[in-house]
Swiss-Prot record:
Organism this protein belongs to: Alkaliphilus metalliredigens (strain QYMF)
Primary role: The RecF protein is involved in DNA metabolism; it is required for DNA replication and normal SOS inducibility. RecF binds preferentially to single-stranded, linear DNA. It also seems to bind ATP.
Primary site of residence: cytoplasm
CDD domains, per database record: ABC_RecF
Entry protein name: DNA replication and repair protein RecF
Length: 368
């Protein structure tokens, strides 16, 4: 799939922008705070329905304006999508796909698939379990919208259950109904996550072996907070989940919080048997994330039948020449949007299919 055109009105620092994109490599060059990342943010917003930089729609609206408009024209193998979003200062955003208003955010997912790679992605390795769960949830939701709905439902049930536990802290409390609901939805999430991690772990391992010339082996392991076996069915997981909720009931009442479930899941990243978070160098951590992102491209391709659009936000300059070469090699069949402050460090001399853009204060022109 490719993005043919992008239109922005009062989005971030763009009062008016109409841009035709190259079907392969698009490079946006400019100093900091000129609007390069804003272009990627608009594309991400069109795919996911929210920003990767802020949780507040108002921050994406041009100063002193009441509404921002984003339009992305997507060409897929067998059809086209026209995605439009209107962000409002004082009310919810409006989203249309092919002129049809969407009632729920989840209906947007899958109309445009993207993979984002930014310096912030090192958090997947370096920071806490919440960052890794966010990564899992975001990727599965793109290829399985049902997962997105189940996740929202699970979080609502979890929130209510935690309120009860907190309000009745230390007291006897009948949680049977809440336990059943949490286990039913939670088991479904665990199945999705287990299958996703199995697939992406295999792909990331292959990518990592290639990038490191076979010297390093990357292993990604799903750590479910509910005890599961490889071939457990959703019903077996549900039963096990319920059992663990019952076993932790006294401790949950004492602490006033739910201690078991997908909201406590994690991932382990190991290189040659050692945990990357603790023992990996900065270079190894970057390579692990690069391998993960390349694996995402292949996984989405296998799931939807075509490559997603790749967004690279100021990461090329952080990769050495070999890793740049490995990344560029995998971009031959992928439309890519790259931001950078300088063109010189990028190893793109031999790349013929590309468009270069200069970004200055919310204006985009050809790079001369």
């Amino acid at each position: 799939m490719i993005i043919e055109g992008l239109k922005l009105i009062n989005f971030r620092n763009y009062e008016q922008l109409q841009l035709q994109l190259h079907p392969k490599l698009n490079i946006f060059v400019g100093e900091n705070a000129q609007g390069k990342t804003n272009v990627l943010e608009a594309v991400y917003l069109s795919a996911i329905g929210k920003s990767f930089r802020t949780s507040k729609d108002q921050e994406m609206i041009f100063v002193d304006k009441h509404q921002a408009y984003v339009q992305v024209k997507v060409k897929r193998v067998v059809y086209e999508n026209n995605i439009e979003l209107r962000l409002n200062v004082d009310k919810k955003k409006n989203i249309k796909v092919n002129q049809v208003p969407l009632l729920k955010l989840g209906e947007l997912l899958g109309n445009l698939n993207i993979v984002l790679f930014s310096p912030e992605d090192l958090k997947i390795i370096k920071e806490g379990p919440g960052e890794r769960r966010k990564f899992i949830d975001g990727e599965i939701s793109q290829i399985a919208p049902k997962y997105y709905y189940n996740l929202n439902q699970y979080n609502k049930i979890l929130q209510q259950r935690n309120k009860l536990l907190k309000y009745h802290k230390g007291k006897k409390l009948d949680l049977e109904v809440w336990n059943e609901q949490l286990a039913n939805i939670g088991a479904s999430l665990i199945i999705y996550r287990r299958n996703f991690i199995k697939r992406i772990a295999i792909l990331a391992k292959l990518m990592h072996r290639k990038i490191t010339d076979g010297i390093e082996t990357l292993e990604i392991e799903y750590k479910s907070s509910v005890l599961i076996k490889d071939h457990d069915t959703v019903d077996q997981i549900r039963v096990g989940f319920l059992k663990e909720l019952n076993q932790s009931a006294d401790e949950e009442r004492r602490r006033g919080v739910t201690l078991v479930g997908p909201h406590r899941d994690d991932l382990n990243f190991n290189i040659n048997g050692l945990e990357v978070k603790t023992y990996g160098s900065q270079g190894q951590q970057r390579t692990a994330v690069l391998s993960l992102k390349l694996a995402e491209l292949e996984l989405i391709k296998g799931e939807v039948g075509e490559y997603p659009v790749l967004l690279l936000d100021d990461v090329m300059s952080e990769l050495d020449m070999k890793r740049q070469n490995d990344l560029i090699y995998h971009l031959k069949h992928v439309q890519t949007l790259v931001t950078t402050t300088m063109l010189e460090p990028l190893n793109i001399k031999n790349v013929q299919d590309k468009a270069l853009f200069r970004v200055i204060k919310g204006e985009i022109g050809k790079y001369e």
